């Protein structure tokens, strides 16, 4: 299980990303726009740099929803491969069964 502080920090990052998402999208749109003046693009670049680091969605880590394991997570299920295997063997995941041939 991951440290509770790491899980809490990741949840805090998700909130910050959500808070600044609209502003980031607006600034990035200005940066990519070829019709925008160089001054406007420079201003957008500086505005993007002034946002908090944690406002970038790339800093959010995909973690296991149950124990917070940071690696080997299945996005479709939201759990780690280890947890997935255990739950599948116990029959807790409907429609998932061990293959044999």
Curated annotation (Swiss-Prot):
Q: Which UniProt keywords apply?
A: Ribonucleoprotein, Ribosomal protein, RNA-binding, rRNA-binding
SUPFAM superfamilies linked: Glucocorticoid receptor-like (DNA-binding domain) (SSF57716)
Q: Which GO terms describe its biological process?
A: translation
Assigned GO CC terms:
small ribosomal subunit
* Gene3D superfamilies, per database record: 1.10.287.1480
Question: Does the record's keyword annotation contain Glycoprotein?
Answer: no
Q: Which Pfam families match?
A: Ribosomal_S14
GO molecular function term, any single one: rRNA binding
Q: How does it assemble?
A: Part of the 30S ribosomal subunit. Contacts proteins S3 and S10.
Q: Which family does the entry's similarity section mention?
A: Belongs to the universal ribosomal protein uS14 family.
Question: What is the annotated role of this protein in its UniProt record?
Answer: Binds 16S rRNA, required for the assembly of 30S particles and may also be responsible for determining the conformation of the 16S rRNA at the A site.
This protein is called Small ribosomal subunit protein uS14
């Amino acid at each position: 299980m991951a440290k509770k502080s790491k899980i809490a920090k990741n949840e805090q990052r998700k909130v910050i990303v959500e808070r600044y998402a609209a502003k980031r999208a607006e600034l990035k749109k200005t940066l990519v726009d070829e019709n925008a003046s160089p001054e406007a693009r420079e201003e957008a670049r500086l505005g993007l740099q002034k946002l908090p680091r944690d406002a970038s969605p790339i800093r959010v880590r995909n973690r296991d929803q149950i124990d917070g394991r940071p690696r080997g997570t299945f996005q479709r299920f939201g759990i780690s491969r280890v947890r997935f295997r255990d739950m599948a063997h116990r029959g807790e995941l409907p429609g998932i069964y061990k293959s044999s041939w």
